[in-house]
Amino acid sequence: MKKQNPIALLPIAVFLVLYLGLGILFEYVMKIPMGFYNVPIIIAFLVAILVACLQNRSVKFDQKLEIMAQGLADKNIITMLLIFLTAGAFVGVVGRSSAESVAYFMLSLIPARFAVMVLFVVACFVSIAMGTSVGTITLIVPIAAAVSDASGFGLPLCIGSVMGGAMFGDNLSFISDTTIAACNGQGCQMKDKFRENFFIALPAAVMTLVVIAILSFRTDIAGTVSQEYHLLQIVPYIFVLFGGIAGINVFVVLIIGIISGTVIMLATGNTAPYDLLTNMGSGASGMFETCMVAVLVAAMCALIREYGGFDALLSGIYRTFRGKRGGLLGMGLLVGLIDIATANNTVAIVMANPIAKEMAQKYDITPRKTASILDTFSCIFQGMIPYGAQMLVAISAVHELGHDVSAFNILPYLLYPMFLLVSSLVAVLVVEKDV
């Protein structure tokens, strides 16, 4: 083990102060809408890397560049970047109308009494298929508002149900950036992480549906929601979902999804060939910031590791958390605290990955379990913070439709993250020997 050096963790502190401090300033002092997401996260990481480069004068600048380059020369990082871009292209191909078709198709099958339960299930399915909780919320929350207006269900309950379903899907999706980051960071297969997560997420989802059902039967129903949909547009999502569950290589699954989506969108006349290429490019470019964050975090962490910062952090963790259960709780708390600070679960996972990997080796925890814990706990915290992208996007969407609702109205109805926390803690406490 290298010499422990807590000062080497200064770049992380600088990043958190910049990102969290400016976010609070913009959001709560200057009252800028979605202030946290107006903070340029890439600039914050560049400043943090500059601080890291100014540390440890005994190492020449050229050597520091070489250390950062070695940190990037990792198969998992390259794989992560390529999957990000390919997943973005897939989402660009299938577009908004396909996700809406999924929602309206399922709403058409179920009586109005169960509309909120359907919203939760629809959000689960769409988020698994799209791989983005924010994208799912953007698409489904306006439908949730329509359900609330037509049926008499409370708007906070409808929004909370959609947000819960979106986080369920984001946690399990094979093309979610959090799944990609966790699996590639820990070196495990996505199907193995899916199986680990599924048995934690399913009980939480079932309990959420039970509570939603109880609340639904206490509500007087006034009407229902109906809208045209194109069933054929659901097919690419089905290919991606079942291909991932079957354990087919993620690149093959995404290419099948892109090809099937291209054929269907062109055959139905929903998209012109030129627009299709533009949409693919837009989808891929939408992942550029996430890719750059992964690159910058890898470079920064390489310097921190070289200086002995991670050894100091790990030493403190080892003194506090003992045994496999302690190690799993330590990982969950670590990624959760980073998520609270950054309000971005992908960034939290990317930053926690190298530390969690060393913890896993120390406590003899399998890569699939480590990836599952990182993804699940980041999902829990991200799904409950009132300044997260999911909450802000949901509120913005309903405000545009003329509804007045605050984060604190919605928080009591974020049932899924609450039950997921309970389910995760139970999973940690009854952990088996071969995790």
Tell what function each PLM region has.
Residues N38-L46, L50-Q55, K64-S98, R113, ...:
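Core transmembrane alpha-helical segments of multi-pass membrane transporters/permeases
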Residues D74-M80, Y104-V122, S148-C158, Q227-V235, ...:
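Membrane-interfacial loop-to-helix junctions in multi-pass transporters
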Residues R57-K60, A73-K75, G152-P156, A181-F194, ...:
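Juxtamembrane helix-boundary/capping and inter-helix hinge elements in multi-pass membrane proteins
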